[in-house]
From Swiss-Prot:
Assembly: Interacts with chaperones HSP70 and HSP90; this interaction is required for initial targeting to mitochondria.
Primary location recorded for the protein, binned into one broad class: endoplasmic reticulum
Pathway involvement of the protein, from the record: Lipid metabolism; fatty acid metabolism
Residues annotated as binding heme: C437
Protein name according to UniProt: Cytochrome P450 2E1
Keyword Metal-binding: yes
Catalytic activity: an organic molecule + reduced [NADPH--hemoprotein reductase] + O2 = an alcohol + oxidized [NADPH--hemoprotein reductase] + H2O + H(+); (5Z,8Z,11Z)-eicosatrienoate + reduced [NADPH--hemoprotein reductase] + O2 = 19-hydroxy-(5Z,8Z,11Z)-eicosatrienoate + oxidized [NADPH--hemoprotein reductase] + H2O + H(+); (5Z,8Z,11Z,14Z,17Z)-eicosapentaenoate + reduced [NADPH--hemoprotein reductase] + O2 = 19-hydroxy-(5Z,8Z,11Z,14Z,17Z)-eicosapentaenoate + oxidized [NADPH--hemoprotein reductase] + H2O + H(+); (4Z,7Z,10Z,13Z,16Z,19Z)-docosahexaenoate + reduced [NADPH--hemoprotein reductase] + O2 = 21-hydroxy-(4Z,7Z,10Z,13Z,16Z,19Z)-docosahexaenoate + oxidized [NADPH--hemoprotein reductase] + H2O + H(+)
GO biological process: 4-nitrophenol metabolic process; epoxygenase P450 pathway; lipid hydroxylation; long-chain fatty acid metabolic process; monoterpenoid metabolic process; response to 3-methylcholanthrene; response to bacterium; response to ethanol
Organism: Rattus norvegicus
Activity control, per UniProt: The omega-1 hydroxylase activity is stimulated by cytochrome b5.
GO CC terms: cytoplasm; endoplasmic reticulum; endoplasmic reticulum membrane; Golgi membrane; intracellular membrane-bounded organelle; mitochondrial inner membrane
Protein's UniProt keywords contain Mitochondrion: yes
Top EC class of this enzyme: oxidoreductase
Location of the protein in the cell: Endoplasmic reticulum membrane; Microsome membrane; Mitochondrion inner membrane
């Protein structure tokens, strides 16, 4: 009888929880955008393909329209699909939706740094970081010289492969890693430096793990899954190791800091910290400095590295495009002069290819989640404060009206009828508004200069027939992860 009583009590308890959950879901749905009816606790998880959530969003948008609501666990999510909705949220309502949506795997850093910070320090830290990055040449001539210098190191390393097959992941990745390391720490690594290779391995592994089905599940049901084994623990461990490195670099800088003569971004942040050392609520603590540096280091290395690597794979599949690029490089730059930013005006095809690579690979398809900072009326719906908002970037990059045959790689998407470069307002690979990527100018410059330098000196050779190269990402979640591959680079005669 005792066992039966306990069983009945448990059933009543579970039933009560289910009823409360259903009631909450229905109650909280008033005035929200439409969407599929959520199951208790689980929400709409079965409406999503965890191996390709952006594709699921596209299917749901066809059914419910460009603005729709999902419930995942206790999270209420509004998804925006298409140019009009995404642009309106990111630009016309940029203050109302400037919060950072909760990402549980990075919960420890929710109120620190730039990328995942959703606390009171975010605006000031971001504003100051942008200011010092500009001072250190972000998107300006200072960075052009840095990238040109690193491009020559990269070319020399590629020559050492002597035409033999190699995995480009870390060799190519060293170039953007060194550019951002010079800006942040006044330091560059040798291409075989163990610490550099270790850091890039951590960046690469985290970018991959963030895109796996388990992490998509974890970020929506963290309350139930956080104590289980899984790759979320590996990500947290990797982030801790990266942050430990930036913390050590900050401490090293502090020992020789001259507040009147900053050597790099780290010094600039530490000088602000020194100014606040008597404040009761300092913004620039050593913890916040180290997380900010880790954010910039990861973002400045991995995204550009992955884009370049994916770009090389694409060019091997389409050798006729590579040939056109060689012709343009030979005509504008020649065989020996170092590529420069000014060349972009005379190289519309290279400019178009760089943009098309970014559009086609769709590196961060669903953007990082935003959050409503206040109750907001949007297109006739009420989006309550705290709602996670996802402006899907892939819905712009793969818009079939703006980019005919969006599933195909076509540099012509960014060329007019006269062969001149044609910019598209749908090109939002770096997002837009208050949360736009702080390194957009640097990344654009790196992609153009590094790819130009590689193709100036080398022909790309695939180990398989170009027709057999599969460009499909191995997984799509936080990012679109390219397949692993090897290639040969053959010096051009």
């Amino acid at each position: 009888m005792a066992v039966l009583g306990i069983t009945i009590a448990l059933l009543v308890w579970v039933a009560t929880l289910l009823v409360i959950s259903i009631w909450k879901q229905i109650y909280n749905s008033w005035n929200l955008p439409p969407g599929p009816f959520p199951l208790p606790i689980l929400g709409n998880i079965f409406q999503l393909d965890l191996k390709d959530i952006p594709k699921s969003f596209t299917k749901l948008a066809k059914r419910f329209g460009p603005v729709f609501t999902l419930h995942l666990g206790s999270r209420r999510i509004v998804v925006l699909h298409g140019y009009k909705a995404v642009k309106e949220v990111l630009l016309n309502h940029k203050n109302e939706f400037s919060g950072r949506g909760d990402i549980p795997v990075f919960q420890e850093y929710k109120n620190k740094g730039i990328i995942f910070n959703n606390g009171p320090t975010w605006k000031d830290v971001r504003r100051f970081s942008l200011s010092i990055l500009r001072d250190w040449g972000m998107g300006k001539q200072g960075n052009e010289a840095r990238i040109q210098r690193e491009a020559q190191f990269l070319v020399e390393e590629l020559k050492k492969t002597k035409g033999q097959p190699f995995d480009p992941t870390f060799l190519i990745g060293c170039a953007p890693c060194n550019v951002i390391a010079d800006i942040l720490f006044n330091k560059r690594f040798d291409y075989n430096d163990k610490k550099c290779l270790r850091l890039m391995s951590l960046f690469n592994e985290n970018f991959y793990l963030l895109s796996t089905p388990w992490i998509q599940l974890y970020n929506n049901f963290a309350d139930y899954l956080r104590y289980l084994p899984g790759s979320h623990r590996k990500i947290m461990k990797n982030v801790s190791e990266i942050k430990q490195y930036t913390l050590e670099k900050a401490k090293e800088h502090l020992q020789s800091l001259d507040i009147n003569c900053a050597r790099d971004v780290t010094d600039c942040l530490l000088i602000e910290m020194e100014k606040e050392k008597h404040s009761q609520e300092p913004m620039y603590t050593m913890e916040n400095v180290s997380v900010t540096l880790a954010d910039l280091f990861f973002a400045g290395t991995e995204t550009t590295s992955t884009t370049l690597r994916y770009g090389l794979l694409i060019l091997m599949k389409y050798p006729e495009i590579e040939e056109k690029l060689h012709e343009e490089i030979d005509r504008v730059i020649g065989p020996s002069r170092v590529p420069a930013v000014r060349d972009r005006l005379d190289m519309p095809y290279m400019d178009a290819v760089v943009h098309e690579i970014q559009r086609f690979i769709n590196l961060v398809p669903s953007n990082l989640p935003h959050e409503a900072t206040r109750d907001t009326v949007f297109q006739g719906y009420v989006i309550p404060k705290g709602t996670v908002v996802i402006p899907t970037l892939d819905s712009l990059l793969y818009d079939s009206h703006e980019f005919p045959d969006p599933e195909k790689f076509k540099p012509e998407h960014f060329l007019n009828e006269n062969g001149k470069f044609k910019y598209s307002d749908y090109f939002k690979a770096f997002s837009a508004g208050k949360r736009v990527c702080v390194g957009e100018g640097l990344a654009r410059m790196e992609l153009f200069l590094l790819l130009s330098a590689i193709l100036q000196h080398f022909n790309l050779k695939s180990l398989v027939d170009p027709k057999d190269i599969d460009l499909s990402p191995v997984t799509v979640g936080f990012g679109s992860i390219p397949p692993q591959f090897k290639l040969c680079v053959i010096p051009r005669s």
